């Protein structure tokens, strides 16, 4: 932990993370072929309401197919519907008890092996990079360099338009921007 506020509470932070993961998994379990990104966003909002979130650190992101390659700031192409063999991601940033639970995950519809490989590589790169950060105390630049190399080892190119940020008590922007 570094540079958290005086109100930071580890159990509250961990609970926020777990609730956020639950929301993402519940939304994914209700995703259906034919949905649009707007439908996915509505489903996320309905699910967040059920979990009594406080506010959002960032807008929901529910991206499908080719739109998954866009940065968060880029506008999605219209007219994209989830197909039988498709890839999509969910990224949400709710706060619970003033602690951020930002979490995202990539999913697939169907059994497309290429999509499965992408998802597995994403998770492997994430966990290997997190491990290296913990064990080696990487700086931000070193962390992204390491992640780039891990992506390349897995046959992919890291999309540097999609940078992450620290998590903790809200707002973390004081430390991020």
Regions found by a protein language model. Give the residues of each.
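Active-site neighborhoods and metal-handling regions in enzymes and metal-associated proteins
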Residues: 1-177
């Amino acid at each position: 932990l570094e540079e958290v506020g005086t109100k930071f509470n580890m159990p509250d932070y961990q609970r926020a993370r777990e609730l956020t993961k639950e929301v993402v998994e519940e939304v994914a379990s209700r995703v259906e072929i034919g949905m649009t990104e707007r439908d996915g966003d509505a489903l996320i909002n309905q699910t967040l309401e059920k979990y009594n979130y406080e506010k959002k650190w960032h807008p929901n992101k529910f991206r499908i197919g080719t739109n998954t390659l866009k940065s968060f700031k880029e506008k999605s192409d219209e007219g994209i519907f989830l197909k039988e063999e498709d890839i999509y991601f969910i990224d949400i940033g709710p706060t619970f008890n003033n602690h951020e639970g930002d979490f995202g995950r990539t999913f697939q519809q169907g059994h497309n092996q290429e999509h499965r490989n992408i998802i597995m590589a994403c998770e492997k790169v994430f966990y290997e990079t997190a491990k290296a950060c913990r064990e080696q105390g990487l700086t931000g630049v070193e962390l992204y360099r390491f992640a780039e190399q891990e992506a390349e080892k897995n046959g992919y190119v890291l999309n540097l338009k999609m940078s992450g940020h620290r998590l903790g008590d809200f707002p973390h922007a004081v430390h991020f921007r």
